[in-house]
Amino acid sequence: MLKIIKKIISALGYKLIEKKLYKNSINLEILNAINTKDVLRNLYKNNLVNKIVQIGANDGLRFDELRSFIIEFNTKALLVEPIPEYFLNLKNNYKDQKNIVLENSAISVNEEQKIMFKVDSKFYELYQDHVYGLSSFKKSHLIKHGVRNKHIISEKIKTTSIKDLLNK
């Protein structure tokens, strides 16, 4: 019966997602943002941060709790973003910062090419702002976030190991 309802809803251009998944993700975002900024502010005030590695830096603006601290305190930072489209924006958004090293890779065990899934940019306006930065090696991860299968594209990206990354 649920399959029939899902097909009808899908034919109308909608998708059913678990209510608790959506509700929990919103609650976590709110709590996480408050706590993260407080913790970072405290660490910086006490001079406990001098280098940062940010995995999944996206464009350096959206949902980025670190950007203001990196710029304000001139922190040395290694910013990693696998999706070429987002990486170009990241590069542009930090172009005036001399303390930044940028890496266009995903993290994996080895240096290799892997398939990563993301929302096709043609469909961004159909979703909430967070889908812009939503990408994964698993297509099911995007579907779990309410992205329709036909709105997902794959992209071959470069990967590197943590060890190799930290040696850069």
Regions found by a protein language model. Name each.
Residues 2-168:
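Phosphate/nucleotide-binding beta-alpha loop and adjacent structural elements of enzyme active sites
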